[in-house]
Amino acid sequence: MSNAVHETDSKNTVASKPPLDPHLKALENEAIHIFREVAAEFDNPVMLYSIGKDSSVLLHLARKAFFPGRIPFPLLHVNTGWKFKEMIEFRDNIVKEYDLDLISYTNPRGALENVTPFSHGSALYTDIMKTEALRQALDAGQFDAAFGGARRDEEASRAKERIYSFRTPDHKWDPRNQRPELWNIYNGMVRKGESVRAFPLSNWTEVDIWRYIEAENIPLVPLYYAAERPYIERDGMMILAEDERLELLPGEEIKHGSIRFRTLGCFPLTGAIRSEAATLQDVIAELEIATVSERQGRAIDRDQSGSMEKKKREGYF
C-alpha cells in the first residue's frame, strides 16, 4: 500500500459525501465545537500531531472546523527520532498536501546524549524524549492550549480526564483538581502560566474512529493495515524488523508474517498484532470482537514506573 496521501477532495476543499451516521455526526459536531471554543478562548493554541489514526481524525476535524480557511494554529510533532519510517514519510506528505504549519521538535539534551529506547530503557527514554520534549516545545512556543487526540476508552487515567485538562505552569496534571463540565460548557479561564490540554475525541471509541475514517475517506499510515512484514518477538510483543537500528538480542531471529498495528508510536516500543485485516472493513470487523485495549501494544504502559497516570502527572500527552 502506498504512503501517498489519497483523498477524494482537493487540498483546500472537503468533498461532498453521503450523510454521516447520526452517532458519528453527533461526535463530529462536539469535536468541531471544542475546536472552535478553544480557538476563541485562548491566545496561542497548538495541535499535537503524533501521525497516528487519532491524530489523522483530529486533523480532519480541525480542517472542517475552520473551513474554508486554513487551520489557525500550527501542528506540533514531538519527534523522538524513533518513529516508524513510514510515519515520517506520511507526515511530510500530509503537511505538503494540506499546506499545514508544522513544528517538529526534538529534545536537544536527548539528542546530544544519544538517548535511545535500547540504551536508556522505555521509561527514561519516554520521560526525556517525549514528556520533557513536549514541555520544552510548549514553553518555547508559549502555547496556552494544546489539542490532543486522547480518548477516554483507551486507558484508565484517560477515562477520568476532562475534555479541558488544566495544567500547572510546569505542565503537570492533578486529577483531583479538575473543573466540572456541564453539557457543552467549558471553563477556559486560566491563571498566568497555566495551560489547557483539550481533547475533542474524548467521547469517541476506537471503533468510532475507524468508522469515521471509513465514512470520511481519511488517509492513514499503511502500517494500520495487515501485510506480510518482518518482525521479531521480544517481551511478548512483535516488533517490526524493517529498521537497520533494531538491535537483535542473542537468540532472536527475524520472522515473517501478516501483521498490523492498532496503535503507532516509536518502533522499538510498539508491538504489532497478527492480522489478516488489510482493508478498512476488515479492521472494523476485527475490532468489533476484540477483547483487549489497543494500548496493550505499547511497552511504555506496561510497568508501574511507566504508567500512563504517572506520565500524565509529569506533563505527558
UniProtKB/Swiss-Prot annotation:
Xref: InterPro entries: PAPS_reduct_dom, Rossmann-like_a/b/a_fold, SO4_adenylTrfase_ssu, Sulfate_adenylyltrnsfr_sub2
Subunit structure: Heterodimer composed of CysD, the smaller subunit, and CysN.
Keyword Nucleotidyltransferase: yes
Role description: With CysN forms the ATP sulfurylase (ATPS) that catalyzes the adenylation of sulfate producing adenosine 5'-phosphosulfate (APS) and diphosphate, the first enzymatic step in sulfur assimilation pathway. APS synthesis involves the formation of a high-energy phosphoric-sulfuric acid anhydride bond driven by GTP hydrolysis by CysN coupled to ATP hydrolysis by CysD.
Keyword list, A-Z: ATP-binding, Nucleotide-binding, Nucleotidyltransferase, Transferase
GO molecular function terms listed in the Swiss-Prot or TrEMBL record: ATP binding; sulfate adenylyltransferase (ATP) activity
Protein name, UniProt field: Sulfate adenylyltransferase subunit 2
Organism the protein comes from: Agrobacterium fabrum (strain C58 / ATCC 33970) (Agrobacterium tumefaciens (strain C58))
Superkingdom classification of source: Bacteria
Originating gene: cysD
GO biological process entries: hydrogen sulfide biosynthetic process; sulfate assimilation
Record has Chaperone as a keyword: no
UniProt record similarity statement: Belongs to the PAPS reductase family. CysD subfamily.
Highest classification ranks of the organism: Bacteria, Pseudomonadati, Pseudomonadota, Alphaproteobacteria, Hyphomicrobiales
Enzyme Commission number(s) from the entry: 2.7.7.4
